[in-house]
Amino acid sequence: MEPAFGEVNQLGGVFVNGRPLPNAIRLRIVELAQLGIRPCDISRQLRVSHGCVSKILARYNETGSILPGAIGGSKPRVTTPTVVKHIRTYKQRDPGIFAWEIRDRLLADGVCDKYNVPSVSSISRILRNKIGNLAQQGHYDSYKQHQPTPQPALPYNHIYSYPSPITAAAAKVPTPPGVPAIPGSVAMPRTWPSSHSVTDILGIRSITDQVSDSSPYHSPKVEEWSSLGRNNFPATAPHAVNGLEKGVLEQEAKYGQAPNGLPAVGSFVSASSMAPYPTPAQVSPYMTYSAAPSGYVAGHGWQHAGSTPLSPHNCDIPASLAFKGMQAAREGSHSVTASAL
């Protein structure tokens, strides 16, 4: 029965790609060659490729072996458990030792010879994979041994007590019989102030302490704050106002100047001296501007010296403006005098 897998070569023989030739066929090739048969005839007779026959015969003539594989076999393993043990010992004695120093020590101590000593890369791989974790574990164990036993954690802000009114009220309520008592810190959340709050920095009692003055707790911060009196602060001179000399303030008030172009602050006009607003006269919608400008707008004190009431910035305006359809109205219109305004 032919095998279920395989290929047929050019001579009609069956072979499996990637697998060596069976030892029986190899031995038969060597026997036929010793009988003086040419390799080409052996190839045709056994239906094996000519290259395979030539390679088997060449290896047999060189090494005397018909077995497949590399000539001389693979390199023996050099990283034996004994070598790894010595490498670990060297590393524990000197954690900063290099791989090439370990290699020299293996040769000096007679653990290996020049034929089976591991290479520097092999020693580095052993240090990284096999000894690295053990060294870290050893350092961790030694660190734990030298560490002192941890002390029980103190409660937050144990020096200054800040009982909250909720906790104080809960402590006054009696527990009914048959029900286990629950600590105040578990039953009611306590409002612990921040250690960096303004009240803690200044030494002032918090609001919760002011509410629960009847609490049996006592805070030394109250004593510290009460000890600070007015005597501890620098006294202010009687002639000083807010840290400034009174004479300086009076001098500034005496020689104070108002801004340029604006009236002084104290120059106010009383309401009784002001005349009421005049009643506007009825003016025709077709009034023209032929009248004098002073008849419509009163002058102001802040106008330019060479300007007119209608042109405060010394801009010339034509005397009259002509509009279509308003010529007749101009003749019939009456001018409004200044007394009418």
From Swiss-Prot:
SUPFAM superfamilies: Homeodomain-like. Residues 82-130 are annotated as: RED subdomain. It comes from Macaca mulatta. Interacts with KDM5B. GO terms for molecular function: DNA-binding transcription factor activity, RNA polymerase II-specific; RNA polymerase II cis-regulatory region sequence-specific DNA binding. The gene is PAX9. The lineage of its organism: Eukaryota, Metazoa, Chordata, Craniata, Vertebrata. This is Paired box protein Pax-9. Keywords: Developmental protein, DNA-binding, Nucleus, Paired box, Transcription, Transcription regulation. Residues 7-63 are annotated as: PAI subdomain. Residues 4-130 bind DNA. Residues 168-189 are annotated as: Interaction with KDM5B. One of its GO terms (biological process) is regulation of transcription by RNA polymerase II. It is found in: Nucleus. CDD domains: PAX (cd00131). Transcription factor required for normal development of thymus, parathyroid glands, ultimobranchial bodies, teeth, skeletal elements of skull and larynx as well as distal limbs. It holds the Pfam family PAX. One of its GO terms (cellular component) is nucleus.
